[in-house]
């Protein structure tokens, strides 16, 4: 962990665009809860403490560690806090069914839209640490791993995502939480896409812009795609959706 933290300090933390909270670089560890499962509580805690020490020696006030997981569990959140994590995040929110362990599939995106705000309020009221609300862009992992034992979110729309952004702004105003995650942006093989694409155009980015940005007096810049300037988007031949197994 010291080697990893040293690399972070030398190559990432000192860049202007790197996210910092109270001056501390943010490190979001995917499936952070597995540190304890794989190495034990004492070793997991020592990993994070070693990274904190490296960051302080490099001139930073420390690291703001975030543990990412698939859903929220208050008891597990308390365990993560005891290891040294200060915040939680969810890779993608897939509706209240996921919270209760009801992994029904397929699942309509409308269900995700309708329950996001209530979920954020639930986590905010029960978590022993802060969290990053996840603004879900959908989920369909069939191109990567097929359909067996996976949740598939259907009928994803930029209009629905705009409603999620509106609720996120409402939640931020209610709680004072200033940090939100849009996620994912570019998981093309998992159907979680916020970047411009043929299905939604610029719709999802426009929703974020309109809800959280400050419109210039001259209006928003014109959206330009590669084809607008005579460029073709590269395409890989032979890609096709895996059949349902």
Spans of features found by a protein language model:
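Glycan-processing catalytic domains of CAZymes
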Residues: 1-245
